[in-house]
């Protein structure tokens, strides 16, 4: 990637002098800057633009880092092969005529992919504009622009859109750290670029225009890794695109691409925006270290009508208007005219001077119910727009609550906006735009907060017996079925700790009567058929049966009705089920396989109207308690189940338990293509799955990897093992979990000064919640932390931690080990380092390294015994390194 994006030598394959040609434009862009050597390649020319032209890349006398290919598509595979033989590691294919041209073009892409794998080169494109990096004077594109250096990395899959935005940015004096057009993304994709610019010190924020994600697992891993430190802003079109596949389940029908992408972006800490016009505004404001802690906005305005417009925009976008406290109203009374609005929006009236504005803003800032302030100015009254702007800038510098401004009008307002722009304070010409920006800030902060939340520990069985269930699925497929019946689906749920209503599948009326008498009236009858997914649609459900006579009548009527409506369907029997006498709420909990992001989980309002109300949210497994709660909170039905019109509130903790258990089931079973629990019924404090259906993915039965259906690596239970210290004390070695934050905090707080300095190279008195969360909530693809857990009489505690963090090139990893003072010299440090070496081997790393205090003789001795080389460094440090391959 370094050769690709920071080359010293570049070959332009297809260079020409023809005016207006791509080959000439690319060459002119590259030679405009003298920082690197550029070699034209064209077998038909001896010279191009006064430079020697080479017939092939193999004739160039030096090693080339980057080749830019601008020749016809049919000749590209052979040229990529030639580049590979010449040792060229980076290639940009600008040429078009690949998959966008049909099957023949797709075949050319497949050839290039095989060649790329053979030589290990990295390729951007094909069908792209190229790459621009202003800070290093690299313009390997055919765009006739040279953007100024800046702090925004803009990556676009669409060349036309990328070109237009770049042109607009040039006019608006916006600079870039990088512009890249990715085209068809046969190799380098968004995940690769995020990794690269995430490590780039010139990049402060990352903007993406995405049509397709590429490697979703790589994208999620990269985005989660850098979203904490650099805002990632995404535009992904296709909000109303319907899935081309006919879904069997409600979940499959509802959870479309838009919702799945939305869930992925939230999980990664990425902010999604809807309009291109918002891209650069979002990039600027999201860098702010002061993001709103909540959605509640106070509006201070000198025009009541504009305040109403701002309020409408806020409510339409699901924001909240702050309810000012009685104390705030009282304080405002002392500063406002007698006939002021006495509420939010705070109308300071048209004759307001600067002091009245300032007093209103300060009162709102001191109100705990205010998370941010929108200040609106219209050109009237005594307040001069530029002087008022300067006072607001002073206030904004002293508060952690964001202040956004709207200066409406022409020349006078422009003077105030200039003050804000000079001082990096968000300012807009319309209240709608300002409100939208505030809510982007809130959503981004909320997404980041999710990364920092510590989940509560739930008593969910993390490893229930499952192999007999996999045998059940295999038998089902062998029978020629891909749809589990209700009873089989409930078997999966029950074994994972999810409460289900018991069903009796009966073959005749006598069996049905016996089952009803055993379970007790009232009962429900449901048709059982491998050909019928939605029973209600064919009249296949009868409720409220209270007697033997009623059951006899309804049993026969049920079968006749279904045969009339679905004469081709095979009827396997009739299910008899105890009926809930009162259902307070009906929910749906389901899963489906998305073509890009693997299996996703859906929660929402259930029942027969589930696809009409469409009140649901989507999340990516695996889920913990925090993520389960967030999944519920994003629906309207969550407010209802808090208690509604005399109905009792649901047991939210039990629902969290059920959702996490369901997530575990989905993680363990790649064989599940779609699954619905509908309804998941709540009656008082009781929760039960009344109906369930499961669609099997036959292809997944032969999958070599148990987690290919997931884009977020689940908890790596294979590293869990009991182990004894030298003194015989037994500990549990296992990967760290987000729930471990309290135990890690306790361990760090009880360490000696020497132990802390040995790990952190400085005296550390207090570690923030955010940092502890970062230590515990890790991406198991890119990092591993093994903890030693000691179980004492009434509690568990951590006594040691070994960690390896993998570099973004996935070739090496840095390790560190910390053992509690009370448990040193007992073999634990040696064991942790050895486990980290094994993990590095498994992940295919080439080397493991660490930085150790030279005075830490014990750790250096362990490293030498395990085969590390030790090299002294300045400042009393030593570098230890172990080459694995």
Where are these regions (language model features)?
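Generic detector of short, aliphatic-rich beta-strand segments that form the cores of beta-sheets
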Residues: 689-694, 878-880
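Long, contiguous binding/interaction regions
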Residues: 698-885
């Amino acid at each position: 990637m370094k050769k690709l994006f920071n080359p010293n030598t570049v070959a332009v394959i297809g260079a020409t002098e023809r005016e207006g040609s791509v080959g000439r434009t690319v060459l002119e862009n590259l030679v405009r800057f003298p920082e690197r050597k550029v070699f034209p390649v064209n077998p038909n020319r001896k010279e191009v633009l006064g430079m020697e032209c080479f017939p092939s890349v193999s004739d160039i006398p030096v090693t080339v880092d980057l080749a830019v290919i601008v020749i016809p598509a049919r000749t590209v595979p052979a040229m990529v092969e030639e580049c590979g033989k010449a040792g060229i590691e980076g290639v940009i294919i600008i040429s078009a005529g690949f998959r966008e041209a049909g099957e023949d073009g797709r075949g050319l892409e497949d050839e290039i992919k095989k060649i790329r794998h053979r030589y290990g080169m990295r390729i951007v494109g094909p069908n792209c504009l190229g790459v621009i990096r202003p800070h290093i004077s690299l313009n390997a594109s055919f765009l006739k622009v040279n953007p100024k250096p800046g702090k925004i990395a803009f990556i676009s899959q669409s060349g036309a859109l990328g070109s237009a935005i770049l042109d607009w940015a040039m006019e608006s004096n916006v600079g870039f750290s990088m512009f890249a057009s990715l085209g068809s993304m046969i190799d380098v994709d968004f995940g690769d670029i995020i990794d690269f610019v995430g490590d780039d010190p010139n990049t402060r924020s990352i903007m993406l225009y995405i049509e397709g994600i590429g490697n979703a697992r790589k994208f999620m891993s990269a985005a989660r890794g850098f979203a904490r430190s650099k805002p990632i802003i995404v535009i992904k079109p296709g909000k109303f695109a319907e899935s081309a596949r006919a879904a069997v389940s409600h979940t499959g029908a509802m959870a479309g691409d838009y919702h799945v992408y939305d869930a992925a972006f939230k999980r990664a800490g990425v902010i999604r925006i809807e309009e291109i016009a918002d891209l650069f505004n979002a990039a600027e404001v999201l860098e702010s270290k002061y993001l709103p802690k909540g959605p509640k906005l106070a509006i201070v305005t000198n025009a009541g009508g504009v305040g109403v417009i701002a309020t409408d925009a806020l409510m339409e976008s699901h924001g909240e208007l702050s309810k000012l406290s009685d104390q705030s109203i009282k304080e405002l009374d002392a500063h406002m005219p007698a006939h002021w609005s006495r509420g939010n929006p705070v109308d300071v009236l048209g004759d307001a001077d600067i002091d009245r504005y300032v007093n209103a803003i300060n009162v709102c800032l001191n109100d705990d119910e205010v998370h941010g302030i929108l200040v609106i100015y219209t050109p009237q009254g005594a307040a001069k727009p530029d002087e008022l702007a300067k006072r607001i800038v002073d206030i904004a510098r002293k508060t952690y609550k964001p202040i956004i401004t709207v200066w409406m009008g022409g020349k006078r307002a422009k003077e105030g906006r200039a003050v804000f722009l000079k001082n990096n304070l968000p300012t807009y010409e319309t209240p709608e735009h300002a409100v939208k920006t505030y809510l982007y800030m809130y959503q981004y902060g909320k997404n980041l907060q999710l990364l920092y939340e510590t989940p509560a520990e739930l008593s969910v069985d993390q490893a229930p017996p499952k192999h007999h269930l996999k045998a059940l699925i295999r038998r089902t497929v062998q029978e020629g079925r891909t749809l589990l019946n209700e009873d089989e689906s409930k078997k999966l749920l029950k074994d994972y700790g999810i409460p289900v209503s018991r069903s009796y599948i009966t073959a005749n009326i006598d069996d049905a009567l016996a089952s009803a008498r055993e379970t007790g009236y009232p009962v429900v009858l449901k048709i059982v058929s491998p050909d019928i997914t939605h029973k209600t649609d064919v009249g296949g459900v009868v409720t409220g049966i209270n007697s033997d006579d009623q059951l006899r009548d309804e049993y026969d009527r049920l079968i006749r009705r279904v045969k009339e409506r679905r004469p081709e369907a095979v009827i396997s029997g009739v299910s008899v089920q105890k009926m809930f006498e009162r259902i307070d709420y009906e929910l749906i909990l389901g899963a489906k396989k998305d073509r890009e992001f693997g299996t996703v989980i859906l929660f929402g309002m259930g029942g027969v109207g589930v696809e009409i109300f469409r009140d649901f949210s989507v999340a990516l497994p695996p889920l913990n308690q925090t993520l389960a709660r967030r999944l519920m909170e994003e629906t309207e039905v969550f407010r209802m189940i808090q208690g509604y019109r005399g109905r009792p509130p649901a047991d939210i903790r039990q629902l969290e338990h059920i959702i996490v258990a369901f997530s575990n089931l989905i993680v363990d079973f790649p064989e599940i293509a779609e699954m619905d629990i509908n309804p998941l019924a709540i009656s008082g404090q009781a929760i039960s799955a009344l109906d369930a259906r499961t669609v099997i993915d036959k292809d997944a039965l032969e999958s070599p990897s148990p987690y290919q259906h997931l884009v977020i690596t689940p908890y790596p239970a294979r590293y869990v093992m009991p182990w004894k210290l030298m003194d015989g004390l037994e500990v549990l070695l296992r990967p760290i979990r987000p729930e471990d934050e309290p135990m890690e905090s306790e361990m760090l707080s009880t360490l000696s000064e020497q132990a802390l300095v040995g790990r952190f190279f400085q005296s550390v008195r207090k570690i923030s919640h955010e940092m502890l969360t970062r230590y515990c909530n890790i991406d198991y693809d890119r990092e591993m932390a093994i903890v030693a857990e000691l179980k004492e009489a009434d509690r568990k505690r951590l006594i040691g931690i070994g960690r390896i963090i993998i570099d973004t090139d996935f070739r090496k990893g840095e390790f560190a080990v910390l053992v509690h003072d009370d448990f040193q010299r007992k073999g634990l440090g040696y064991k942790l380092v050895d486990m980290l070496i094994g993990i590095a081997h498994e992940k295919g790393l080439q080397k493991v390294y660490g930085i150790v205090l030279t005075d830490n003789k014990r750790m250096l001795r362990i490293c030498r015994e395990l085969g590390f080389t030790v090299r002294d460094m300045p400042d009393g440090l030593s570098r230890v390194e172990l080459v694995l391959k």
